Design a protein with these regions (language model features):
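Catalytic cores of nucleic-acid ligases and guanylyltransferases
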Residues: 1-205
Length: 205
């Protein structure tokens, strides 16, 4: 299992051509180790949660190649509206029999934003934008598996984030290596105060 790279909180995001920007989703950070016949989903605390999200088994068919390790966020939606309370209900389940009835009523999505290994090769020492480029080439969108978009413009993503009421925005240096378990200034996050409910499905998809 791999410990995900973390972002430092800041009051204001950095600007400039050295950064890209992504929406910060309020979900469960999850590393996905996928092969054509196997899938392992693990949390920041190295907990195996594969059995809690059987609808994400489709991830095994969502990329070209033999094997891959992804970094992303599991999010629960209720009629297009993200609900962390709904996700917590799924997070707490251990029994597969309890999960099954919720697959139709309370499904989850996995938003992928990084590629850590591919076809047996580690990408930790590969710059972020090269990882993003390879991820885009091999990724196949699935019913419950999506690619998280990123922006070059801080102003544009901040406008969208506030419009749709997202939790925040993450800025990442284009040349950043992937540093498992480390919280560095290469990735920084700015959180917003959220008051109302909001719809995210249309914009992210």
């Amino acid at each position: 299992m791999i410990s995900p790279m973390l972002s430092k909180p800041v009051e204001e995001l950095p600007s400039g051509k050295n950064y890209i920007y992504e929406i910060k989703l309020d979900g469960q950070r999850t590393i996905a180790e996928a092969g054509k016949k196997r899938l392992l989903l693990s949390t920041r605390g190295f907990q195996n949660v594969t059995g809690r999200y059987p609808e994400l088994q489709g991830l095994k068919q969502c990329f070209k190649g033999e094997d891959a390790i992804f970094d992303g966020e599991i999010v629960a939606l209720e009629k297009g509206i993200p609900s962390f309370q709904l996700l917590q209900r799924r997070m707490s389940l251990r029994d597969a029999r309890a999960v099954t009835p919720l697959l139709e009523t309370d499904p989850v999505l996995y938003y992928v934003f990084d590629l850590l290994h591919y076809n047996g090769r580690s990408l930790f020492r590969t710059p972020l934008m090269e990882r993003k480029s390879l991820l885009k080439k091999i990724f196949i969108t699935g019913e419950h598996v999506k690619l998280l978009p990123f922006f070059d413009s801080k102003e544009k993503i901040l406008q969208q984030a506030r419009k749709f009421g997202y939790e925040g925005v993450v800025a990442k240096r284009r040349d950043s290596f992937y540093l498992p378990g480390q919280r560095t200034s290469l990735w920084v996050k700015q959180k917003f105060q959220l008051i109302d409910s909001f719809v995210i499905g249309g914009w992210l998809e």
